[in-house]
Curated annotation (Swiss-Prot):
SMART domains assigned: Tryp_SPc
Record's keyword annotation contains Signal: yes
Assigned keywords, A-Z: Disulfide bond, Glycoprotein, Hemostasis impairing toxin, Hydrolase, Protease, Secreted, Serine protease, Signal, Toxin, Zymogen
PANTHER family, per the entry: KALLIKREIN-1 (PTHR24271:SF47), KALLIKREIN-RELATED (PTHR24271)
Protein's cellular compartments: Secreted
Described function: Snake venom serine protease that may act in the hemostasis system of the prey.
GO MF terms held by the record: serine-type endopeptidase activity; toxin activity
Name of this chain's protein: Snake venom serine proteinase 4a
Peptidase S1 domain location: 25-251
Proregion residues excised on maturation: 19-24
Tissues showing expression: Expressed by the venom gland.
Organism: Crotalus adamanteus (Eastern diamondback rattlesnake)
Native organism taxonomy: Eukaryota, Metazoa, Chordata, Craniata, Vertebrata
S-S pairs: C31-C163, C50-C66, C98-C258, C142-C212, C174-C191, C202-C227
Length: 260
């Protein structure tokens, strides 16, 4: 377990931003089957690996650490065992990383853009998610979702995605929560969670979206091994900071590089 020491005044400050929730199950409740048309599942090759987000008919955004040689993508899925009629399967045609490499750290450049081998069509359970027009503010209530384990004590992977609401927190909270990683003073990541614990993304949710006001703001990168632990939020790659890179790659400028 990660050991943390947070000053009392920092906790009080952040509790003023955080909003209490009635959801008590780590990872939240089963998502409405119609609220995640953009959510995709990455497989490697026979086991579920990560989540991802559909940007348009040909492009998916996820975390760089989810990359595997033989991965494939399922779109339009709700239940792993009861398929939707409009589910589609694709494989990567191309993969793009920051600086044309797979180099990333716990706090920077954990982002991968995947071009599908053929376009997908919008349908009842498939549609893209909007990229952000501005960054989220501290205190924003955001939605997380995925097929990751709903308990970190005993890994339990659901057949259907679970959703929960969490808050954007000041980056200082994550600096205090993970001192052993020596995070930089500033970062292109978002710190998000519930300070009181109880709700969080978890193993298997990596690469999935953080959605604030209907816009795609973050990609789950990493968090504490004990999901939903008090005062230990997760970190998400900040999508807004990578907009130029994303848009240039999609437009055909494959030499585009991420922000420094």
């Amino acid at each position: 377990m990660v050991l943390i020491r947070v000053l009392a005044n920092l906790l009080i400050l952040q509790l003023s931003y955080a909003q209490m929730s009635s959801e008590l199950v780590t990872g939240g409740d089963e998502c409405n089957r119609n609220e995640h048309r953009f959510l995709v599942a990455l497989y490697d090759p026979d086991r579920f690996l990560c989540g991802g987000t559909l940007l348009n008919e040909e492009w998916v955004l996820t975390a760089a650490h989810c990359d595997r040689r033989n991965m494939w993508i399922k779109l339009g899925m709700h239940s792993k065992t009861v398929p939707n009629e409009d589910e589609q399967r694709r494989v990567p045609k191309e993969k793009f990383f920051c600086l044309s490499t797979k180099n990333y750290t716990l706090w920077d450049k954990d982002i991968m853009l995947i071009r599908l081998d053929s376009p997908v069509s919008n349908s009842e359970h498939i549609a893209p998610l909007s990229l952000p027009s501005s960054p989220p503010s501290v205190g924003s209530v955001c939605r997380i979702m995925g097929w990751g384990t709903i308990s970190s004590n005993k890994e339990t992977y659901p057949n259907v995605p679970h959703c929960a609401n969490i808050n954007i927190l000041d980056y200082e909270v994550c600096l205090a929560a993970y001192p052993e990683f020596v995070l930089p003073a500033t970062s292109r990541t978002l710190c998000a969670g519930i300070l009181e614990g109880g709700k969080d993304s978890c193993k298997g949710d990596s690469g999935g979206p953080l959605i604030c006001n209907g816009q795609f703001q973050g990609i789950l990168s990493w968090g504490n091994d004990v999901c939903g632990y008090i005062l230990q939020p997760a970190l998400y790659t900040r999508v807004f900071d990578h907009l130029d890179w994303i848009q240039r790659i999609i437009a055909g400028n494959t030499d585009a590089t991420c922000p420094p």
